[in-house]
């Protein structure tokens, strides 16, 4: 690049965030080698992609944590975190058994390999579900007991803590993305104004995902407190 002016401005960005003006500092005389628009856009796109993937994963983790906490109604997701020692290897219960809900207050675990019944029973007993399995030699039945008022309040606190952990994870994603933008600024690929604008756009996206966590939390809390 050669120019008489101190700065060269180029337009970049067509992704999720708004189109921005990139300001590249340049000496008044001589030639300055700088990144192309395509290279800058590629780096920004990678940051956006990473942010999106990590935020979606955070929401999935929050949902999985909530699903593992039982309410008074039967739900196969309650068994998501149970690992069974299957031929010496910790294995997800759902991968070795069919789980169904005969009614609103019970679960039926039907192993594909009947020899794993005792191991499945042991895994359920050792879990924090607080449910005693009934092994009839063919399937395992789980009767979901009603939650006491104190237990509902206790579980509500656990869910609230998990929701807050999800929000912290989202804020950490924002922090990491801003560090990446700051790095591009130091490399003269983005101006200070670019970084401010991108950070502002990013905050709006994070705020939307925090609202998702709040919505999921309120729904789970409602389930827990419903008698």
Swiss-Prot record:
> Where is this gene product found?
Plastid, Chloroplast
GO terms classed as biological process: plastid translation
Q: Which InterPro entries match?
A: Ribosome_recyc_fac (IPR002661), Ribosome_recyc_fac_dom (IPR023584), RRF_sf (IPR036191)
Q: Which NCBIfam families match?
A: frr
Cellular component (GO) terms are: chloroplast
This chain belongs to the protein called Ribosome-recycling factor, chloroplastic
Which parts form a coiled-coil structure per UniProt?
167-212
What are the alphabetically sorted keywords of the record? Chloroplast, Coiled coil, Plastid, Protein biosynthesis, Transit peptide
Q: What is the lineage of its organism?
A: Eukaryota, Viridiplantae, Streptophyta, Embryophyta, Tracheophyta
């Amino acid at each position: 690049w050669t120019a008489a002016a101190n700065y060269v401005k180029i337009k970049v960005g067509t992704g999720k965030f708004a189109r921005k003006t990139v300001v590249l500092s340049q000496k008044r005389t001589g030639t300055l080698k700088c990144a192309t628009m395509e290279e800058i856009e590629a780096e920004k796109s990678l940051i956006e992609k990473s942010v999106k993937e990590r935020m979606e994963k955070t929401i999935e983790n929050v949902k999985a944590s909530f699903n593992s906490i039982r309410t008074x109604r039967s739900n196969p997701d309650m068994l998501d975190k149970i690992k069974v020692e299957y031929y010496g290897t910790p294995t997800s219960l759902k991968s070795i058994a069919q789980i169904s809900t005969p009614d609103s207050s019970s679960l039926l675990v039907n192993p594909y390999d009947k020899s794993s019944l005792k191991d499945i029973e042991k895994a359920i007993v050792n879990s924090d579900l607080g449910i005693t399995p009934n092994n009839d030699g063919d399937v395992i039945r789980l009767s979901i007991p009603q939650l006491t008022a104190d237990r509902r309040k206790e579980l509500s606190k656990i869910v609230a803590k998990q929701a807050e952990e999800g929000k912290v994870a989202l804020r950490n994603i924002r922090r990491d993305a801003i560090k990446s933008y700051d790095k591009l600024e130091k490399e003269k690929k983005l101006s200070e104004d670019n970084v401010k604008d991108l950070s502002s756009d990013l905050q709006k996206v994070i705020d939307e995902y925090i609202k998702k966590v709040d919505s999921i939390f309120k729904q789970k809390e409602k389930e827990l407190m419903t008698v």
